[in-house]
Structures are given as C-alpha cells and as structure tokens.
C-alpha cells in the first residue's frame, strides 16, 4: 500500500509540473511576440519630417531641412 501511495504522489507531481511548464511556455511565447512588435516600426518616406537618419526609409535625413531625402 505504501508503494502505491508513493507512485500516486509521484505521478501527481509530474502531472502538475507538466501543466505548469505548458502555462509558462504560453506566456513566454506571448512575451516574445510583444517584444517583436516593439521592434517593428514604420519609416518616414522622402519629403517627410525627420530628426535622425534612422527615421527615414532610405536612411538619409537632411538635418538642415529636417526632411527625409
């Protein structure tokens, strides 16, 4: 009877651990998606306002006129 009780408790712990890790994996995937969406941004086309080169689609900002060239 003692052996059966130990096996039952072990099985319960394994099932709980598996369920817990699945829940964490869902959250981990969701966080990864959120991070990727933060990195995705639109660029400013030629003639649009800019402050630095990284804002322009063609990667060149005329700082004198503050427009993408």
Curated annotation (Swiss-Prot):
Propeptide: 18-41
Tissue expression profile of the protein: Expressed by the venom duct.
Keywords for this protein: Disulfide bond, Knottin, Secreted, Signal, Toxin
Subcellular localization: Secreted
GO cellular component: extracellular region
GO molecular function, one term: ion channel inhibitor activity
Covalent S-S links between cysteines: 43-57, 50-61, 56-68
Domain of life: Eukaryota
Keyword ATP-binding: no
Sections of the chain in a coiled coil: none
Pfam families named in the record: Conotoxin (PF02950)
Other noteworthy facts: This precursor corresponds to allele E1a. Has not been merged with other alleles since they may differ due to geographic variation (see strains in PubMed:19606224).
Family from the record: Belongs to the conotoxin O1 superfamily.
Domain notes from UniProt: The presence of a 'disulfide through disulfide knot' structurally defines this protein as a knottin.
Protein name listed in UniProt: Conotoxin Eb6.1
Lineage: Eukaryota, Metazoa, Spiralia, Lophotrochozoa, Mollusca
